[in-house]
């Protein structure tokens, strides 16, 4: 279950399905990925589908995980006690 968001606007998107910071072509896919995160009880629940490209992050993001949304867009988060914390949407360049 998603417990906390690192970005207040992403939490607004979670509740409304719209936000000016989310490109319209990304909205439906982002909702599906966030639903998947909300249902997950362990990071292993996110290994399928393979398009998630679940991976542990390193360096300054040590302890975080990421899944692919589309193109260079990723959802980054911490997973603890079966819950998602500090969820954020980032675009890698």
Predicted segments, located by residue:
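Arg/Lys-rich, positively charged N-terminal/basic patches that mediate binding to nucleic acids
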Residues: 1-33
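Basic, amphipathic alpha-helical segments enriched in Lys/Arg and hydrophobic/aromatic residues
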Residues: 34-37, 41-42
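A short, surface-exposed loop/turn module that caps and links secondary-structure elements
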Residues: 42-65
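Enriched for short, Lys/Arg-rich terminal
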Residues: 58, 65-93
């Amino acid at each position: 279950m998603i417990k906390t968001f690192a970005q207040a606007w992403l939490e607004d998107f979670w509740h409304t399905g719209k936000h000016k910071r989310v490109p319209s072509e990304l909205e439906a896919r982002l909702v599906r990925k966030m639903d998947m995160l909300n249902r997950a009880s362990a990071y292993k629940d996110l290994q399928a589908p393979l398009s998630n490209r679940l991976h542990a992050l390193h360096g300054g993001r040590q302890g975080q995980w990421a899944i692919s949304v589309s193109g260079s867009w990723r959802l980054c988060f911490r997973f603890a006690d079966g819950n998602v914390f500090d969820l954020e949407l980032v675009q890698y360049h």
